[in-house]
């Protein structure tokens, strides 16, 4: 599977909850509907946090993956 194209990347490595979520929330406010944000994080709680965040705020979690202790997410702004 090819990874989704993205418009902006946020590096949230070494940040702990709630910092990654706040960075994503703030950056999505700057994007237009349909634009895609890639997030790189190391906090395992982001797996749950980003899934729930997208569901509640009508964004789409297009793809997520984990490699070692690094989590990557592609979020489309709703």
State the predicted function of each range:
Residues 2-11:
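Right-handed parallel beta-helix/beta-solenoid
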Residues 7, 34-38, 70-72:
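Intrinsic-disorder/low-complexity, polar/charged segments enriched in Ser/Thr/Lys/Arg/Asp/Glu/Gln
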Residues 2, 45, 64-67, 72:
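Generic serine detector
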Residues 1, 22-26, 70:
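A broad "ordered helical/assembly scaffold" signature
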Residues 12-65:
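Amphipathic, hydrophobic secondary-structure cores in small proteins
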């Amino acid at each position: 599977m090819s990874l989704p194209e993205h418009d902006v990347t946020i590096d949230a490595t070494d940040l702990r909850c709630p910092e990654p979520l706040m960075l994503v929330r703030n950056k999505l406010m700057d994007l237009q509907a349909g634009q895609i944000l890639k997030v790189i994080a190391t906090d395992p709680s982001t797996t749950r946090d980003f899934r729930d965040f997208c569901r509640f705020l009508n964004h789409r979690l297009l793809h997520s993956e984990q490699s070692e202790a690094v989590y990557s997410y592609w979020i489309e702004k709703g």
